[in-house]
Regions:
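A cytosolic small-molecule/anion-sensing beta-strand core signal
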Residues: 21, 49-50, 65-66, 84
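Histidine-centered active-site/metal-ligand motif
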Residues: 37-39, 78
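Ligand-binding loop in jelly-roll beta-barrel domains
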Residues: 74-103
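Short acidic-glycine-tyrosine-enriched beta hairpin
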Residues: 58-76
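Short, conserved beta-strand element in jelly-roll/cupin
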Residues: 29-31, 39-57
Length: 114
């Protein structure tokens, strides 16, 4: 995975690295705050490959360290925030939009395959 992460420098721009049973395996680098959003139909899994970030919810903040993961249940408003660059692996249905129910400058409608 480290080799694949070395192929891009952009933040909040998921890259597709594989597909399994209608789900995509994506790599993404976080840095700074993401947009508040919710995913109506999908739970989200955020395993940390390198670094650390915080998952913010309206009522709490959860630290996620390297080698750990967090699952965000569907319909839960959240946003990841990373003070420093963090490398995250995503496993999601192919139809999942990175900004969920929100359109923003960070929305990636057609992720690049690397």
């Amino acid at each position: 995975m480290s080799q694949k992460f070395s192929l891009f420098t952009s933040h909040w721009d998921p890259k597709i690295v594989g597909e399994v049973n209608g789900h995509r395996v994506k790599l993404v680098k976080f840095q700074g705050p993401f947009v508040w959003h919710r995913d109506e139909n999908e739970d989200e899994l955020f395993p940390v490959h390198k670094g650390r970030f915080a998952m913010e919810f309206r009522d709490r903040r959860v630290a996620v360290e390297e080698g750990e993961f967090i699952i965000v249940p569907r319909k839960t408003e959240h946003r990841p925030v990373a003070e420093e660059e963090v490398h995250v692996v995503l496993f999601e249905p192919a139809t999942t939009l990175n900004t969920g129910d929100v359109e923003s400058e960070l929305t990636v409608g057609a992720p690049e395959r690397i």
